Amino acid sequence: MNLNKQVAIVTGGASGFGAAIARRLSQAGAAVLVADLNAEGAQRMATELNAAGGRALGMACDVSKEADYRAVVDAAIAQLGGLHIVVNNAGTTHRNKPALAVTEDEFDRVYRVNLKSVYWSAQCALPHFAQQGHGVMVNVASTTGVRPGPGLTWYSGSKAAMINLTKGLALEFARSGVRINAVNPMIGETPMMADFMGMEDTPANRERFLSRIPLGRFTRPDDVASAVAFLASDDASFLTGVCLDVDGGRNI
């Protein structure tokens, strides 16, 4: 797929799914602004992409804050020459535990990062997309937003809301030439795996979760990156409001 002359923002792009997404978009020809709460990690990823022949910029960003998100959008336009793709990948979870054991602070953090980020991306990026008559947003949701499991109730609710927001925004902005889709990964090999499992990340504990996945493995960062790159490309030009499961059959 060809993303030449496209400029993309990837939030949470310093590690995990986000890093793989940033690499894949860069390999496809897009200039990439890597935004992450970890400023050093964002700069490191941008340096990697530039060294590989891409064009990238790294910035610190708290996606729950308007000023931070707007600064990232403005930087993409001013320093990379435009904005055509926004990937809302930054996210967080509470540790896997009973719903009533989740504290108010944990609840607020999950909803602030997972949902307010979509609000600010819409406020900051969608007017630009609508004005230029085209643009793509891809939200990284979760299979738990479709099929919740015990121990992740509040996290699952945040991802279900993200999926519904994706569809609502897709309807509202379709006539402006803007496509808005989501991907729903299964539990993946990222630094948050222990939190999702609610136990130490060991081979034995992983096996308990693998038994639920028909294809017999966890979601890999490259799986998510491939799905995001497809949805961001013209190969998916007639897809909007789609929530693509990247889960090895978990949601069947």
Swiss-Prot record:
Chain sites annotated for binding NAD(+): 9-36, 62, 159
GO biological process: catabolic process
Quaternary structure and interacting proteins, as annotated: Homodimer.
Residues at which substrate binds: 142
Regions annotated as coiled coil: none
Described purpose of this protein according to its UniProt entry: Involved in the toluene-4-sulfonate degradation pathway. Does not discriminate between the sulfonate and the carboxyl substituents and can also be involved in the p-toluenecarboxylate degradation pathway.
Catalytic activity field: 4-formylbenzenesulfonate + NAD(+) + H2O = 4-sulfobenzoate + NADH + 2 H(+)
Name this protein carries in UniProt: 4-formylbenzenesulfonate dehydrogenase TsaC1/TsaC2
Record-linked Gene3D superfamilies: NAD(P)-binding Rossmann-like Domain
Keyword NAD: yes
Keyword terms: Aromatic hydrocarbons catabolism, NAD, Oxidoreductase, Plasmid
EC code(s) of this entry: 1.2.1.62
Record-annotated active site: 155
Family the UniProt entry places it in: Belongs to the short-chain dehydrogenases/reductases (SDR) family.
Enzyme class of the recorded protein, top EC level: oxidoreductase
Pfam families according to UniProt: adh_short_C2
Name of the gene this protein is made from: tsaC1
SUPFAM superfamilies reported in the protein's UniProt record: NAD(P)-binding Rossmann-fold domains (SSF51735)
GO molecular function annotations of the record: 4-formylbenzenesulfonate dehydrogenase activity
